Amino acid sequence: MNDKTIPVTQPSLPELAEFMPYLEKIWKNKWLTNNGPFHQELEEKLCEFLGVQHISLFNNATIALITALQALRITGEVITTPYSFVATSHAILWNGLTPVFVDIENDGYNIDYRKIEQAITPKTSAILPVHCYSTPCEVEEIQKIADNYGLKVIYDAAHAFGVNFKGGKVYLTMVIYQFLVSMRRKSSINFEGGAIISPDAKTKLRIDRLKNFGIADELTVTAPGINGKMSEINAAFGLVQLKHIEGSISKRKIIDSLYRNLLKGTPGITIFPGNINTNSNYSYFPILIDDGFHMSRDQAYELLKKNNILSRKYFYPLISNMPMYRGLISASVDNLPIANSVADKVLCLPIYTDLNEEIVVKITKLLLGKM
């Protein structure tokens, strides 16, 4: 069908000429890292864009998540979702903590807040939900539970940059962003970065020290920190990309709508509508393929691949079924029936800013057996 491979996602890059003046300034300043002027400017611009006061930039979102757990001095058990990229649970494990998995919603992909309370034990100290596929969790309900039990809440918002929820950008308590970054699902990383939104200046100060080896000043180290600093080049790229984020979202929205219209009403294919109070960033287009469709999920994946179209079984396998986690009591299939069922059915179709609408039509025709 295609001579050229269609990736499941692709970076949306500015014109190189737009980026060059930033590089020239970096070369002139000879300031490559350690809280340079572009780093400082990006923190300020992101605060304005998201409507928050305290942001800390990181070299990537995984290091940010590890640092957030460390900054809040989390101990014992952390309630989280099995339906996410593995970095979510790895960050918990790297802190010497135990992830406790809770099943996802029956009509979505996020953690089911109604099942959180039964997973709380005397060892529980935090809840780590994920805004999956850019759809916000039930943040108000989760916060009520956290307040009742004295728990911290850290949101992994890697999917949710630029998402509006009930009239405001998605954030609450502490948020980990993988922002302004497009990746070919880890196979070809172009620019990378992460950020933490903190609830107050004191928490931001601790985070900023932790990401810089725990250094407080030239003579004082206050904590066993790491190197999580964002470089000036990545910060500069973030500043350029921030100018285009709304336009990119608008273009992906068109692709999302086209997929929905072409696949609407197809027996055996489920497309969740998303939260009615949310304006998505349209970075993912997941469908669920069940026995009512004329081929299985895996057959659809192979058919697309045979025609040089890369889809992804995202998230399969579940985190809870991976070797380092499947021994946990909470990882049992009986405890996570919905997440396991969704993981066996999900297929993310190509969606990115520069995806041609004609390709979307061809992808859907191929799936529906019309070619």
UniProtKB/Swiss-Prot annotation:
GO biological process: lipopolysaccharide biosynthetic process
Keyword Hydrolase: no
Family: Belongs to the DegT/DnrJ/EryC1 family.
Cofactor requirements of the protein: pyridoxal 5'-phosphate
Catalytic activity: dTDP-4-amino-4,6-dideoxy-D-glucose + 2-oxoglutarate = dTDP-4-dehydro-6-deoxy-alpha-D-glucose + L-glutamate
EC numbers for this chain: 2.6.1.33
Residues recorded with modification N6-(pyridoxal phosphate)lysine: 186
Function field: Catalyzes the conversion of dTDP-4-dehydro-6-deoxy-D-glucose (dTDP-D-Glc4O) to dTDP-4-amino-4,6-dideoxy-D-glucose (dTDP-D-Qui4N).
Metabolic or biological pathway: Bacterial outer membrane biogenesis; lipopolysaccharide biosynthesis
InterPro entries named in the record: DegT/StrS_aminotransferase (IPR000653), PyrdxlP-dep_Trfase (IPR015424), PyrdxlP-dep_Trfase_major (IPR015421)
Keyword Acetylation: no
Major enzyme class: transferase
SUPFAM superfamilies with a match to the protein in the record: PLP-dependent transferases
Record GO terms (molecular function): dTDP-4-amino-4,6-dideoxy-D-glucose transaminase activity; pyridoxal phosphate binding
Entries under PANTHER family matching the protein: PROTEIN RV3402C, TRANSAMINASE
Keywords attached to this entry: Aminotransferase, Lipopolysaccharide biosynthesis, Pyridoxal phosphate, Transferase
Name this protein carries in UniProt: dTDP-4-amino-4,6-dideoxy-D-glucose transaminase
